[in-house]
Each structure stands twice: as C-alpha cells, then as structure tokens.
Amino acid sequence: CGVSVVIHGADLDDLPGSACADHSPQGRVHTGQILEHLGLAAAANLAQAETLLQLQGLVYLPLSAWQPGLARIFALRESLGIRSSVHTLLKGLHPFAPQEAIVCAAVTHPPYLQRLQEFFLATEIPALCFRATEGEPFANPQRRPDLFLCHQGESRLLLAKDHASLAQLPELPDNLAASTSEFISAVLDGRRALPLAIAEQTAALLLLSGRCADLATARALLRQSFTRIAA
C-alpha cells in the first residue's frame, strides 16, 4: 500500500524456550520466523536494514542489530524464567527520529494500555495502540479490539472493539510458521480473504501514516490492493 514497514523483535537464535514460565511464549509463532519462511532475511545492522527497506519495503530488525544492550537484558528471560520491564520499554522504541515513523504498539494487560498511550503523547511519537494478540501487535482476527490513535497531542478511540456475535469463525492457519506464512501468501495473491480486523487495523495505520486522508480512503485503497477482504 505504499508504506515501508520495519518490524523489530527478538533475535531468532534467542527465542525463549522451555525455561520461561511467566507468560511463556514457548510454542508461539514469532514474526521473525514467519518472515524467514517468506524468504525475507533479517537485517544484521541498521545499514543493512535501510538497504533492505529500500529494496523490499519490509524488513525484520533483530534487537541485537540496533540495541545490543537491551538485547542482552531481554535474553535474561531464558535463564531467569520471568519477563522484565524491557518488554514494555521496547514497545515504544524504534530506530528513527520521533517524527520520522509511526508505531504500532500492543500490550497484553489492560492497565498498560493507558500507560502506553501516555508515553506516546509525552514523546510526541505517532502511534496506534491496542490489546495484543498472543503478545504480537496485530488485531485479533476473530474480534477487533479498541484501536486508539495517539497523534498531535491527543489520544482518541478511532475504532471501537467489535461486540457483534460471529456468524462464523475466520479461517485461520495452524500455529506453525510454515502454515502462517502460507496463509499470508494466500491472502496476498487472493486465494484467501484478508481478515476484517486486520484490514481495519491496516486502514488505521494508513491514516496515521498520512498515506490516506481518512478511513474511507484507506479502506478503498485496501480494496484495490487485496482482491478478497472478509466481511
């Protein structure tokens, strides 16, 4: 849709294993693994990330490639078996100047959602904030959460969470990197429908980025870009 995307996350070699007991991510599919299956290599440093971003418009940036100190603290989860405040801190960071990028940030626990919004307002970083799905910043495909827009000194509810009963559950992939990457490929080439909740999240990000002037324009752009969007 014409907007470059940087996804930062854990180093693939340092993903938590069985030692983690506190909200363990063991068994989850991590974004870096999915992108690896899609043939998108992780950047080794910021210079390489910039090159890959120009070439393909999307890049995965491991934490050690731009915040090695925080990466070492993050890796302690494996030995200690608990999370630290680094997890929350990382949600607000990105490798750009404050006004050069927008942030898509999500938290698992409701009390942190307000704190996250306060952080983005204080730092004047434009951001979309919402409840996470398995710790990841994408809208739950089964039911869209509240989407809050932090921009120009205010935080507002852009789209309220979906309370409607589901007529049927969205067709989603198994909890495997290979099947998830195949699902993404199928959505991109029109063999499967883009889940509506994710389409609405994307529309909100297109609005926040300035790519589209309003939600109606963003939704129209998505309909041009994806041949199938779930109802």
Language-model regions: role of each:
Residues 1-52, 59:
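A generic, well-ordered mixed alpha/beta core segment in the N-terminal half of proteins
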Residues 16-17, 36-38, 48-231:
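Glycine-rich anion-binding loops and their surrounding alpha/beta cores
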